[in-house]
Amino acid sequence: MRKEIKREWDFELFFKPDCPFCLKVLNYFKENDIIKFPSYNIEDVVSGYENQDKLYEVGGKVQVPCMVIDGKAMYESDDIIAYAKENFLEKAKENKAKREENK
C-alpha cells in the first residue's frame, strides 16, 4: 500500500524508472526541491497496469514522462521542465524555507 504524503503540488507525474527522459525530469525536480507530489511508476509490479490505465484515461496514450496538471497531460521532458521553471520554482523556494523553519 502506498504511503500517503502531504502534497505540496497540484500535479501528478507518470514515469518509468529506466526512462532517461523521466530521470531527467525527476532529477530536475529533486535538484530544485520540487518534492511531495504524487508519482506513478507505470512498470510497478503491483500497480503498474492500474497506473498505465490511469495515464491512458487522462492523456489518450501511455507515454512517459507525463505530468498531469489541471486534468491535462503534458508530455516531453523539456516541456515539463520549462513549465516547472516558469511555474514552480518560486513556490519550491518558499516550501523549502518553511520546512527549514520548522526543523
Stretches found by the model and what they are:
Residues 1-11, 92-103:
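N-terminal leader/targeting and pre-domain segments
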Residues 1-40:
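Local sequence-structure signature of Cys/Sec-based thiol-disulfide redox active-site neighborhoods
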Residues 20-21, 50, 75:
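Short alpha-helical
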Residues 43-61, 68, 88:
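Thioredoxin-like thiol-disulfide oxidoreductase module
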